[in-house]
Regions:
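Terminal, non-globular segments
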Residues: 1-191
Length: 191
């Protein structure tokens, strides 16, 4: 009996996109400060994979991207994985439970993912005893990063959707409705 699961082409596309985005994030984006903060598009990637592919692939992508980030930046191993797994899972659950198709969904999910990533990572670092000053500067950085990531959410959503759309299985809830055609016999066409 053949197991049903995501197509291999979808998994390959997710892996290639994740590796590319993480390397671009670490090599290019993080080197260009905007408003005194470094932009982090990794939570956006994880949230949008979850929003397009569901909770299982969202959580797996979150774990893999978080582990890759932790390994490349030599951070506390598994901390980013934990936070990104939660982000991917809940974005996927949003898709499975509500099927959001509003135009503002990518902005709201992107803002929530950025806030969850920043607050979650800061909280876990504080709980692990990392000596970092907790002040209004940290709050300013969190707010600015959430705002900037929310602004970047729409372009990131378009990129992730464009890369993954050809491999996504057809979802019966998202079928396009055909316009009713009369074969040219419409009374409006005679005018």
């Amino acid at each position: 009996m053949k197991e049903s699961g995501p197509p291999a082409s979808l998994l390959i596309r997710i892996a290639a996109l994740a590796v590319t985005i993480v390397f671009v994030q670490i090599g290019v984006i993080s080197e260009v400060p905007v408003l005194g903060i470094t932009i982090d598009v990794s939570p956006l990637l994880v949230a949008f994979v979850g929003l397009l592919c569901g909770s299982t692939l969202g959580a797996l992508t979150g774990f893999a991207v978080g582990l890759l980030v932790d390994l490349l930046l030599v951070q506390t191993l598994g901390l980013t994985s934990l936070v990104f797994t939660v982000i991917g899972y809940w974005a996927g659950r949003l898709r499975e439970l509500r099927d959001p198709q509003a135009a503002l969904t990518p902005l709201l999910v992107g803002g929530a993912a950025a806030a969850t990533a920043m607050v979650g990572y800061s909280l876990f670092e504080f709980l692990l005893g990392v000596d970092a000053p907790v002040s209004l500067e940290l709050l300013r950085q969190i707010v600015l990063e959430v705002v900037v990531d929310t602004l970047l959410a729409l372009p990131m959503w378009l990129l992730v959707r464009r890369v993954l759309d050809p491999s996504l299985p057809d979802d019966p809830r998202r079928r396009r409705r055909r316009a009713y055609t009369t074969g040219g016999l419409s009374p409006l066409s005679r005018a």
